[in-house]
Amino acid sequence: MIVDSISSSTASTSSSSPTRGTPIRKSLQCAVCGDVALGKHYGVNACNGCKGFFRRSIWKNRTYACRHGGKCLVAKEQRNACRSCRLTRCLDVGMNPRAVQGDTVEDPEWDEEAMPETLSISTQTDALKVKKKSHTSLFTLDIKKEQIIDNLRAIYARTDPEEFWKLTYPGTYDFRYAFHNTKVVSPRTPLTPTAERIATLNDVVADFRRAFVLFVDILKSIDQLRDVQEDDKMKIAKSRFAAFYWWLCSTWSAKAGCNGVCYSNGSYHPASISDMPKSEGKHGVRIDYSGVSQKSLENLVEPLRRMELSDEERIVGAVMVILADPVPNVSTKTEKILAEARDFYLELLGYCIKLPEEQQGIRVSTMVLLLASIMELVHLTTDNIQLSDVLHVIDLGDWSQELRDHRYRRQF
């Protein structure tokens, strides 16, 4: 794990220096909320409350949503009013999430304590254990990271022989069978997210199916998940596909620059209602009942477009989105495996960012903060698909019923 050094106070050998435990008055201010600061934590002067809040937010991979457009004031008196704006403020002033990953002392769940005006040197020294790795082990780890990135590239580039592209497999298939036999869902056609034409309803369905096959291929490539029991693996697949799908389409849309949701087959779903695809017939019905296309542009595509992600950030970020949130009702062993995989791919995402280490952490955290927008889109998309199903606008197949039933439910 890459760890930033956190400065600590050391006693001077000079006779004029204060002895350990001697009270001294500090005039430092917390860069986040303006309260009294203990010293530097994660790269900036921070009070105990903001230090603990930032630490837990990163450790527990928390995502927050602001109900006021991200414009809340973060000050000592109301710093707990909006956690989303508080975390954004932490990142803006330069707090480094990568330093948190190496911190071995976890704060208690509460983060607000009375702050005395005078503090002793002994209370300001944080214990930090850093695992030292030899140059050889670091080199070996870098090789492994490059291999994983190359493997992900190969998955995105993988295609079936062209003679299989038109084959269909009519029949009734449950989710588990489709997961292990993806040919009944879709062939691996080339991914062409170029947004050259407005999508038809057939394009929408074909993209959903092709994205699911890509999702399964990626999920099966994650080494840490190979020992997960079968039932838990199905829960992971059902609960995380929707978030993965939105990340996939949104990163494609940001790169293609289209005014809508970019698909894998050269088409895109326009944000303009008048241009949206409809079902056949005189009174054709559209599938976007919630304005989800426009919301995806505003809340997800535009921030991604400004970030100008590299190909490595896009493909590793997709895995990070799959692993980002806890999966409900899996075994304790699976929870631990998911947490370990999450930490590994968070580090791998930082490895893909060719910036100074402090800026790496800020960029990674900015991507993680987008998860709140992704989950809002998952809500809206679920409503769209369920209503479309009732109106018989689209038919995704029997295999997808379990996926649609569970794509946002917290219980299985």
UniProtKB/Swiss-Prot annotation:
Compositional bias segments (type: Low complexity): 1-19
NR C4-type Zn finger ranges: 30-50, 66-90
Alphabetical list of SMART domains matching this protein: HOLI, ZnF_C4
A GO term from the CC aspect: nucleus
Keyword Transcription tagged: yes
UniProt-listed PROSITE patterns: NR_LBD, NUCLEAR_REC_DBD_1, NUCLEAR_REC_DBD_2
CDD domains (alphabetical): NR_DBD_HNF4A (cd06960)
Pfam families per the UniProt record, alphabetical: Hormone_recep (PF00104), zf-C4 (PF00105)
Organism the protein comes from: Caenorhabditis elegans
Keywords attached to this entry: DNA-binding, Metal-binding, Nucleus, Receptor, Transcription, Transcription regulation, Zinc, Zinc-finger
DNA-binding region positions on the chain: 27-102
InterPro entries per UniProt: C.elegans_NHRs, HNF4-like_DBD, NHR-like_dom_sf, Nucl_hrmn_rcpt_lig-bd, Tudor, Znf_hrmn_rcpt, Znf_NHR/GATA
Name of the protein described by the UniProt record: Nuclear hormone receptor family member nhr-61
Localisation per UniProt entry: Nucleus
Similarity comment: Belongs to the nuclear hormone receptor family.
Chief location bin: nucleus
Function (record text): Orphan nuclear receptor.
Chain segments carrying region Disordered: 1-23
GO MF assignments: DNA-binding transcription factor activity; RNA polymerase II cis-regulatory region sequence-specific DNA binding; zinc ion binding
Bilayer-spanning residue ranges: none
Residue ranges of domain NR LBD in the record: 144-407
GO-annotated biological processes: regulation of DNA-templated transcription
